Amino acid sequence: MENFFSILGGMGTMATESFVRLINHRTKATKDQEYLNYVLFNHATVPDRTAYILDRSEENPMPFLLDDIEKQNLLRPNFIVLTCNTAHYFFEELQAATDIPILHMPREAANELVRQHTTGRVAILGTEGSMKAGIYEREVKNLGFETVIPDTALQEKINYLIYHEIKESDYLNQELYYEILEEAVERLNCEKVILGCTELSLMHEFAEDNHYPVIDAQSILADRTIERALAERSEALDTASEK
């Protein structure tokens, strides 16, 4: 297979399924051959990223992720998509292990703030691990925006939604999701809310009320993935036609 990308997912699996669904649904295709070529690594058994970030005595996910990168190196995709937000804690080491570009989801989401002409405060919602590591905060601040991180009470609600409701129970609790967004917008006085966790992106995909000013990082990553894949396919076709 030529002109393909690879997806490093499985963290979690349902969120990865959501990402793949976005890729397929948003690709303008009228026949099978117009869809995108990709390989999915659904590595569901990677140790919990947040657990390790919060407590270094927990199992380190890094060796598992590096092994995945090494396997993808052998396949030689055009680029790699990392669909777990918290796994971007290890991004620099992963990118250093390959000459294949890895798309940076938090950076793409931060750039979307510029595209949407954001001027106010930006709330960042995600796992406790990604909050502690500053994965999104760093990218957003680098572009000059004021960031707002959830306080303890709000973070506990986010943790409960991500881990208990979605990951453990496979339950998309819309009422709790709206409550979290309402707090971020009204109580924390934020113009935009970044969904910096793929479980929150999964929640947003199926939410019935989407009037909140959300930047869905996974959705943005899906768009950038499609754009890059189509551009590289077009370039390959142009090169082939010149021969």
Swiss-Prot record:
Catalytic site positions: 84 (proton donor/acceptor), 197 (proton donor/acceptor)
MF-aspect GO terms: aspartate racemase activity
GO biological process: cell wall organization; peptidoglycan biosynthetic process; regulation of cell shape
Residues binding substrate, per UniProt: 48-50, 85-87, 167
Gene3D superfamilies: 3.40.50.1860
Keywords recorded for this protein, A-Z: Cell shape, Cell wall biogenesis/degradation, Isomerase, Peptidoglycan synthesis
Pfam families from the UniProt entry: Asp_Glu_race
UniProt EC number: 5.1.1.13
Pathway involvement of the protein, from the record: Cell wall biogenesis; peptidoglycan biosynthesis
Reactions accelerated catalytically: L-aspartate = D-aspartate
Keyword Transmembrane helix: no
Described function: Aspartate racemase that provides the D-aspartate required by the D-aspartate ligase to be added onto the lysine residue in the peptidoglycan precursor UDP-MurNAc-pentapeptide.
NCBIfam families (UniProt xref): asp_race
Subunit structure as annotated in this protein's UniProt entry: Homodimer.
Family: Belongs to the aspartate/glutamate racemases family.
Protein name (record): Aspartate racemase
